[in-house]
UniProtKB/Swiss-Prot annotation:
Keywords carried by this UniProt record: Disulfide bond, Glycoprotein, Lipid metabolism, Sphingolipid metabolism
GO cellular component: extracellular region; late endosome; lysosome; membrane
Name of the gene encoding the protein in the UniProt record: PSAP
Annotated function: Saposin-A and saposin-C stimulate the hydrolysis of glucosylceramide by beta-glucosylceramidase (EC 3.2.1.45) and galactosylceramide by beta-galactosylceramidase (EC 3.2.1.46). Saposin-C apparently acts by combining with the enzyme and acidic lipid to form an activated complex, rather than by solubilizing the substrate.
PROSITE patterns registered for this protein in UniProt: SAP_B (PS50015)
Protein name stated in the entry: Saposin-C
Amino acid sequence: ESVTCKACEYVVKKVMELIDNNRTEEKIIHALDSVCALLPESVSEVCQEVVDTYGDSIVALLLQEMSPELVCSELGLCMSG
């Protein structure tokens, strides 16, 4: 598993925890903004990169009720299966 894959799955899982199944675009964006700050500095950079690069796509995919694994493989960050 790549670091980017792990970062992506972490971001998506944390966002889902933070929004507590209340999937609105606004809530997801707000959660994306805060999620990397919860990490140690060494990983928060990769986290921020994922958010900066894929944030819009993550929002769109989460609004389609996708799981973290599916979101990240859709983005091409994780190998599916």
